């Protein structure tokens, strides 16, 4: 009998990085479809523009580093970075903002650290935060859902506005965003926060047309439920683990419930927190980034809970309406510390 001796590892996982990235990309399709339904073709244009910009930026740096283009570009990480940034940008934001944010995410936040596997911060969230801080007005100007908007721009109109600032008929972005009386150009989270700071009671704010009698704002609850469906698909396939999404959502739900029970006139309800903004996109597609999140099971629970707490604090007391991007980046800083204190004990070690 012949015994063959091979080097470790003795168990192999056949899943390649490119396949995992593609599965995550496919899981975003339900959310993207719902965003298109409520917010129009501009969302699709921004996503496509961000993906092309991400791939071009990645190819440029790979060429400059004299690395094999096919293997590095074929891991689909740049595609996913562009997609996640594209879905986060308002549908009619200028094209150059998308290109700038995506290039910063890929070149500075990813490749400057050495490429995939070496970046300490989530590249898509770095690009988003850079745009949000640099261009706060453009980054918080969302179209009202098409169902209550006076004019719903078609595909050609969306292209004209994104690349030229006006539609073919001469309508500007401001005119398209006007919608109907009482409809602002902000998201439900932004509308609520701004109204509270102005002294309006919560009940009066939630009666505005942008909420449309929905649990978390017209359109936004369905967007979040669609991303939840995509996230459950990833969990069922074993592409991501449950620890981070569950701890994030549970912590956010607990904190928001306590705040709402104590002062419902000042704090959003837990359903509003869970089904508005980037909650479900963050829970299943952003926080679960294997490079920038914790690597131990206990650490993943701590990481998710920390992000959930930070999101609630930023939404409730901070200057920005959502807070998912800032919370993720702040938690990324703590990952080495979390992993250090939650690493499994070595067998036979005291």
Swiss-Prot record:
TM region(s), chain numbering: 20-39, 89-109, 123-143, 215-235, 244-264, 267-287, 301-321, 322-342
Name of the protein: Ion-translocating oxidoreductase complex subunit D
Assembly with partners or alone: The complex is composed of six subunits: RnfA, RnfB, RnfC, RnfD, RnfE and RnfG.
Swiss-Prot/TrEMBL cofactor(s): FMN
Role description: Part of a membrane-bound complex that couples electron transfer with translocation of ions across the membrane.
Family the entry assigns: Belongs to the NqrB/RnfD family.
Places the protein is found: Cell inner membrane
Membrane topology, record value: Multi-pass membrane protein
Pfam families named among the record's database cross-references: NQR2_RnfD_RnfE
Name of the gene encoding the protein in the UniProt record: rnfD
UniProt keyword annotations, A-Z: Cell inner membrane, Cell membrane, Electron transport, Flavoprotein, FMN, Membrane, Phosphoprotein, Translocase, Transmembrane, Transmembrane helix, Transport
The keyword Cell membrane belongs to this UniProt entry's keyword annotation: yes
PANTHER family: ELECTRON TRANSPORT COMPLEX PROTEIN RNFD (PTHR30578), ION-TRANSLOCATING OXIDOREDUCTASE COMPLEX SUBUNIT D (PTHR30578:SF0)
Listed GO biological process terms: electron transport chain; transmembrane transport
Modified residues (FMN phosphoryl threonine): 187
Keyword Flavoprotein: yes
InterPro entries: NqrB/RnfD, RnfD_bac
Gene Ontology CC terms, in alphabetical order: plasma membrane
EC number: 7.-.-.-
Predominant cellular place of this UniProt entry's protein: membrane
